[in-house]
Curated annotation (Swiss-Prot):
It catalyses: a (3R)-hydroxyacyl-[ACP] = a (2E)-enoyl-[ACP] + H2O. Involved in unsaturated fatty acids biosynthesis. Catalyzes the dehydration of short chain beta-hydroxyacyl-ACPs and long chain saturated and unsaturated beta-hydroxyacyl-ACPs. One of its GO terms (biological process) is lipid A biosynthetic process. This is 3-hydroxyacyl-[acyl-carrier-protein] dehydratase FabZ. Belongs to the thioester dehydratase family. FabZ subfamily. It comes from Cereibacter sphaeroides (strain KD131 / KCTC 12085) (Rhodobacter sphaeroides). The active site is at H57.
Length: 155
């Protein structure tokens, strides 16, 4: 007997903006797919030359900053928490708390489609722990473990 397939969800940019407060120029996830509540999700970031960070990082050699790859993984995780706990339009915030073992494996440049796969290591309450891997065309670009805190509005 095979296990029943887990229900998966996706979040377009409208739902993402109903869950997380980030906006231009710091909204770093365009879509989240393959969301399995309380387990995992895949965020998508289409990297373009029009991004403001390329003005200074680096002139003539645009490279997407590694810290923003980590932030994109964190935003993907926040959307996963929001979908898992039905937080759209409820004023909840998911705050990035810490990061461990961040490693950068390849450059990310304009034209790349960055896929951030995040997996819950511990969650369901106020503090969540994740494992994240970002890749381009199946090639690992960055990885890290990180934690976040859920802040629900009072009242």
């Amino acid at each position: 007997m095979t296990e029943a397939a887990e229900a998966t969800f996706s979040a377009d940019i409208q739902l993402i903006q109903r869950i997380i407060p980030h906006r231009y120029p710091f909204l770093l996830v365009d879509r989240v797919r393959d969301i399995v509540p309380n387990k995992s999700a895949v965020g998508i970031k289409c990297v373009t030359m029009n991004e403001p960070q390329f003005t200074g990082h680096f002139p003539g050699l645009p490279i997407f900053p590694g810290v923003q790859i980590i932030e994109a993984m964190a935003q993907t995780s926040a959307v996963l928490v929001g979908v898992s706990m039905d937080l759209a339009d409820k004023g909840a915030k998911v705050y990035f708390m810490g990061i461990d073992g961040a490693k950068f494996r390849r450059k990310v440049v304009p034209g790349d489609v960055l896929e951030m796969t995040v997996t819950v290591k511990r969650g369901g309450g106020k503090v969540w722990k994740f494992e994240g891997r970002a890749s381009v065309d199946g090639e690992l670009a960055a990885e890290a473990e990180f934690s976040a805190m859920l802040d629900l509005p009072k009242g």
